[in-house]
Amino acid sequence: MSTENNAPVVNNFIRSIIDEDLATGRRSSVVTRFPPEPNGFAHIGHAKAICINFGLAEDYNGQCNLRMDDTNPEKESDEFVEAFKQDISWLGFKWNGEVRYASDYFDRLYDYAVELIQAGKAYVDDLSAEEMRQYRGNLTEPGKNSPYRDRTPEENLDLFTRMKNGEFPDGSKTLRLKIDMASGNINLRDPAIYRIRRVHHHRTGDKWCIYPMYDYTHCISDAIEGITHSLCSLEFEDHRPLYDWVLDNISIEHHPQQIEFSRLELLYALTSKRKLQALVNDGAVTGWDDPRMPTIAGMRRRGYSPAGIKLFAQRIGVSKSENIIDMAILEGAVRETLENDSPRVMAVVNPLKVTLTNYDAAVTASRSAPFHPHHPEFGERDVPIAREIWIERDDFAETPPPKWQRLTAGGEVRLRYSYVIKCDEVVKDAADEIVELKCSIDHDTLGKNPEGRKVKGVIHWVSAEHAIQADVRWYERLFTEQRPDAVRGEDGEYVDFRQFLNPESLKLVPAYVEASVLQAEPESRFQFERLGYFVTDRYEHRKGDKAVFNRTVGLKDSWK
């Protein structure tokens, strides 16, 4: 699949199938589709599918359709449609033509159902949902035919027409395919393809009171759109015979090939829209785009880049094997792309006051510093110094451990892009807490090493006079368990995944940051030197007024 970096394209079995199809003339082009249900926001699992479908279409100079699978109107909305469109565009992909909807094909789907009824291949059933389950059988026992299975095509057509016209109550009748109740594949045991459901649809309004089922809708929609390779996750492998049966038994010429790949399971995260919705509803997160959420909108707000997400999708590859991926792989891909693209600035998140006792405005000079050590085109910024500065409290130790190279009483350290300073005095309050360090500058060390001694430590800092205050949201992983929805209690039942929410997943940290960041636009990514990668918040950062940062990821994996 396509990525924005120079990493090699990973071979996958889908690519091999496409290569053979094109080489043999079975297909002359590649048309894929991404068909989400608009009942929530896109998450990291969708991101993988997006990269596969759109990426393969790009690589083969083909096309990828965006189609909303809107056959379940109770849970779907225009809000989720727009969210999917935004996320796909933000990732850098373009769909073919206009956004398509399964509901665009409701009339044609109905006509094909009539065709199946007339051919004696579908029937109206009066069994209740519970009765249908009892008749279906299981993996070891065949199902039983419904007592309504042998209705004539004429009777079935009359009943189906009346279903459409609203003459029967919700759930009282279904339209089922007549396949084989003894099939070893339960999906072929006369699956229902229409149900009565009086629900307002976000696009068709109240026109329909019957709605087609996913398995029926999906394959026909693919065929209508001329999809060549219908790529879906592995749980639909057992549905493929039904996909093929429907298309083989209606008067439609095009027959796409369904190909399944393993779905993504990301450790320390959830990829169930239902469970993510529960987190939103419970107030465990601030919304679908909370930076702790594994949604594309959440990852975007946290500062993940499209290139990082694409690199992640490319690295995990495409296979039929179980695809359980550690969060560190995602964070590593994001970190790698941010390292190359992020300007550097200094920020202090746990400040300790330092007074430079021999600071003299006439002789104490400031320097400029590059925004990126390897990209001179990023430019430079001024790093002003003043009599009072802030350093990280963690960069001072009154009683240092072995091999300590940062500041200590009587010790020296270099201020990044500035002078070597020496701690001459430690000031404490009545509670014996350190509140200030009094240090002296070696004025001969600006841009050069001190004479006769070696100073190894370098720390970051900001000028108390020039730095701005910023709100920093320090994010960690949302869950403490690798697989929060797969933990069983002593009774053998699954434990509520919400019990494993990380109470330390968000800390609000007041910080001091170089003044240049105040002019940054929302969604500007930075490396805070020695601290990690941060982004100005998409909504709450206000250029020239209020600086709000979200922690994206650390400089290295801290969860090993």
Swiss-Prot record:
Predominant location: cytoplasm
Signal peptide (residue range): none
Keyword Metal-binding found: no
InterPro entries: Gln-tRNA-synth (IPR004514), Gln/Glu-tRNA_Ligase (IPR050132), Gln_tRNA_ligase_bac (IPR022861), Glu/Gln-tRNA-synth (IPR000924), Glu/Gln-tRNA-synth_Ib_cat-dom (IPR020058), Glu/Gln-tRNA-synth_Ib_codon-bd (IPR020059), Glu_tRNA_lig_a-bdl (IPR020061), Rbsml_bL25/Gln-tRNA_synth_N (IPR020056)
GO CC field: cytosol
Cellular compartments annotated: Cytoplasm
One Pfam family it belongs to: tRNA-synt_1c_C
BP term (GO), one: glutaminyl-tRNA aminoacylation
Family in the record: Belongs to the class-I aminoacyl-tRNA synthetase family.
Descriptive protein name: Glutamine--tRNA ligase
Organism per entry: Chromobacterium violaceum (strain ATCC 12472 / DSM 30191 / JCM 1249 / CCUG 213 / NBRC 12614 / NCIMB 9131 / NCTC 9757 / MK)
Highest classification ranks of the organism: Bacteria, Pseudomonadati, Pseudomonadota, Betaproteobacteria, Neisseriales
